[in-house]
Each structure stands twice: as structure tokens, then as C-alpha cells.
Amino acid sequence: MNPIRKIIHIDMDCFYAAIEMRDFPELANKPIAVGGDAKRRGVIATCNYAARQFGIRSAMPTAHALKLCRELILRPVRMDVYQKESQYIRSLLTEYTDLVEPLSLDEAYLDVTESTQCQGSATWIAEEIRARIYQTRQLTASAGIAPNKSLAKIASDWHKPNGQMVIRPEDVSAFVLDLPVRKLFGVGPKMEEKLGALNIKTCADLQRYSVEYLLQKFGTMGQRLYELARGIDNRPVNPERIRKSISVEETYPKDLPNSEACLAVLPDLMARLEARIQRAGKISGIHNLFVKLKFNDFQQTTIERVMDKLDLIVLRQLIQEGFARRGMPVRLLGIGIKLKQENTYQSIQLPLLDL
């Protein structure tokens, strides 16, 4: 039986505008927008919440936005800056799981079902991610946590800005009943109008119709509507990038006091890593082995060695070398492999280790 999934949707709050306010503090609390010149028929890329109070929205013609708010401060698009910030945030997200699916520069899905970070709590992972983004970039993010992508995205918008919401598996059925159909993935203004003509305004209304009727009325979208109205969304989180590593890690309730204690938990980590490699199927071959240690002062170190196979002895050596760098109790220990970035793929033959 497959485990209930833990999906997080991270959505940066008015990303481009937030970067402008951070870099130019004098803009704080003033209505600002990022977009093209009105004289060149430009459009608004995004705006801050002060500007939204005037009715300004993304994709609105800049000339119209300036009519709605004469005090609007228009900032030019600095795409290189926004891309750099997005890359940093994306790198941070991959510290929690390899299963990160970017949707744009300012939002992404994470599947943390198998993550052991923050004691395996998706809620705590989302809180930590948001806190780290603010601490390191002075930008806020909102998060939604749910058993699937559709609900996670809905939840991330619930307490914006700078908030998060959890939809627990046992609460899904009750949550969707009063949910407006416009909130469903794929339901735009035209589809909302078609549903409204049938007096379908909420998911409870939609649940009254059979899948056969919805298929007849809306084609393949009918099946989707039938499932979404019941909180069903089986789409996987698909990482955009080629997988570069496979790893496992554990945050321990009691710090590991010395290198011997770290070595004592290695067999369990090794077994989990082998299982994860097996699930990955054919991969491009091993290039490096690495270990990660996070000490009780929250400083961390990573040490690696070029190897073409999984080797317990080498991992033991890396743990000892990594521990010696600080010689402090360890709160998190991880091991993993980095994969060859080649077009040839192979099945990894795992060693039969005497653990």
C-alpha cells in the first residue's frame, strides 16, 4: 500500500515586487509594480499588495494600471536579479527532497513523503523553508501542505501573504464541499461560466453529477472535474532537472555525541540508501560518494570522494573525516551518491555488505 503523500506548494509573495522593495527600502509601503513602459504598451508583471488595493493585477496594461493609481511607482523588470534569487531558493528546496517541481521563478511543488527532515513533518518542513528564505533573502513565502498537488496549491493561497495552511488527509472530503469550483485546477473564467449555467458553484454541487454526465458535457475535462471535486489528484511531482544524486538522512532526537555513535547508525542509513537506489531503477552510474553532517550548532559540512560504487568502508572514512572537522555532537547525518551526468544509463549492482 502506497503511503499517503505529503505535498508542499511554496509560493513567493509578490516575488518581483518584493525584491524591489528589499533592494530599495524607500519603496516600502508604497504602491509599486514591476512591468513594461506604458508608452510602449507594456504590461504589469507583478505588483505589491499596496498596489493591489487599487485593483492593479498581473498582466494588466501598464497604462490602465497608472489610471487606477496615479501614485503607482513603476519599476523596470530586472530578470537577471529575479532569476538569481529563484536559483538560490530552488537550491534551498532541494535540501529537503530531490522531488522539486518548479512551476515558475516564484513557485514550486515539493514531495516530502520520504523526507526525514524536521522529524518527517511536512508542516515543519514548510515552516523551516519559509523561515530560512526570510532569514537569508529577506523575502516572504506562503505554503500549502496537502496530500496532492491541487489541494496544496489551493492551500498556499489561503493565508497569503507570509502564511501557510495544512489540509490533512482526513479533512479533504469536508474541505472540498464548500470550495468554489473556480479554485479547481484547470477551471478558468469560461469553464466557471459553463458550470454556473448548470448551477454548479461549489464542489458539493459538482459532486451531484455522475462521471458519465460530466464526460458527456465536458469531454475529458469531465473526468478531471469529477476527481478534483472529491479532492483526488494523482499527478506526481515531476522534477524538471535530471536527477543528480540519491541520498538519505536522519535528524536524531538526541545528538550523536561522537564519531563512534555516527558509525553505529550507518548500517540503517546504508540499508535505506540501497533501497532508494533500487527504487530509482536504471541510473547513470555512481560518480561520487558523500556524507553530510549537521552539528548541534546548526553548522553543517559535506565531504565526498570519487567512487564508482557504493562502499561501506569509504563511507565510514568520510564520516570520521567529516566529524573531525568540528568535533561536536551531530544532530543530522546523511549519506548519498552523486550520479554520472551521461546519456548512458545502467542498473547499479549493489554490494552485499556485512553490516
From Swiss-Prot:
It is found in: Cytoplasm. Keywords: Cytoplasm, DNA damage, DNA repair, DNA replication, DNA-binding, DNA-directed DNA polymerase, Magnesium, Metal-binding, Mutator protein, Nucleotidyltransferase, Transferase. Pfam families: IMS, IMS_C, IMS_HHH_1. GO terms for cellular component: cytosol. Binds 2 magnesium ions per subunit. The active site is at E107. GO terms for biological process: DNA-templated DNA replication; error-prone translesion synthesis; SOS response. It catalyses: DNA(n) + a 2'-deoxyribonucleoside 5'-triphosphate = DNA(n+1) + diphosphate. Poorly processive, error-prone DNA polymerase involved in untargeted mutagenesis. Copies undamaged DNA at stalled replication forks, which arise in vivo from mismatched or misaligned primer ends. These misaligned primers can be extended by PolIV. Exhibits no 3'-5' exonuclease (proofreading) activity. May be involved in translesional synthesis, in conjunction with the beta clamp from PolIII. Monomer. Belongs to the DNA polymerase type-Y family. This is DNA polymerase IV. It comes from Legionella pneumophila (strain Paris). The gene is dinB.
